[in-house]
A protein has these predicted regions:
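Non-catalytic beta/alpha edge segments that cap or flank active sites
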Residues: 1-167
Length: 167
């Protein structure tokens, strides 16, 4: 079992003007997949704040998977991808590519996603959209393969040649 954290990035949710619906949904999907969600938080669309909490969570060493939701669009305040790129030491471009590819079967607006994914220390950080529907679709597209990546990242023995339903 891996530990996970969910970070909602939204000015309106942070100010209490709108309930956070994507963050709890993402946390529930993770729990259903066997992850232990050990931390959730809401931050405003401010790059320094996002970077700070990404560094704090990844730096604590207790979370292997950190999912963000929100801030991946074209709005001038959508800066989650930039914050993610600023803190990650290794990028994992296949994850957002897979999410966009899967989402293109639902809507051609998927090509507008600027989501990123990467690694900081032993934590995989993945950006999800802020819409609950899109967050679910994107997470469901990649979740089956993430455990294998997390096993490799954590140094657990994993047979890279083994076939699985996630491939």
């Amino acid at each position: 079992m891996f530990n996970a954290a969910v970070l909602t990035v939204s000015d309106r949710c942070f100010r209490g003007e709108r309930p956070d619906s994507a963050g709890p949904l993402v946390a529930e999907l993770l729990k259903d997949a066997g992850y232990q969600v050990v931390q959730t938080a809401i931050v405003p669309d401010e790059q320094p704040r996002i970077e700070q909490i990404l560094r704090e969570i990844a730096g604590a060493g207790s979370v292997q998977l950190l999912l963000t939701t929100g801030g991946t669009g074209f709005s001038p305040r959508d800066v989650t991808p930039e914050a993610t790129l600023a803190v990650c030491t290794r990028l994992t471009p296949g994850i957002p590519e897979a999410m966009r590819c899967a989402s293109m079967g639902v809507t051609n607006r998927a090509m507008l996603s600027r989501a990123q994914a990467g690694i900081r220390h032993g934590t995989l950080i993945v950006n999800l959209p802020g819409s609950p529907k899109a967050a679910r679709e994107n997470l469901e597209a990649v979740l089956p393969a993430l455990a294998h990546g997390l096993e490799m990242l954590s140094g657990r023995p994993a047979d890279c040649a083994a076939e699985s339903s996630a491939e």
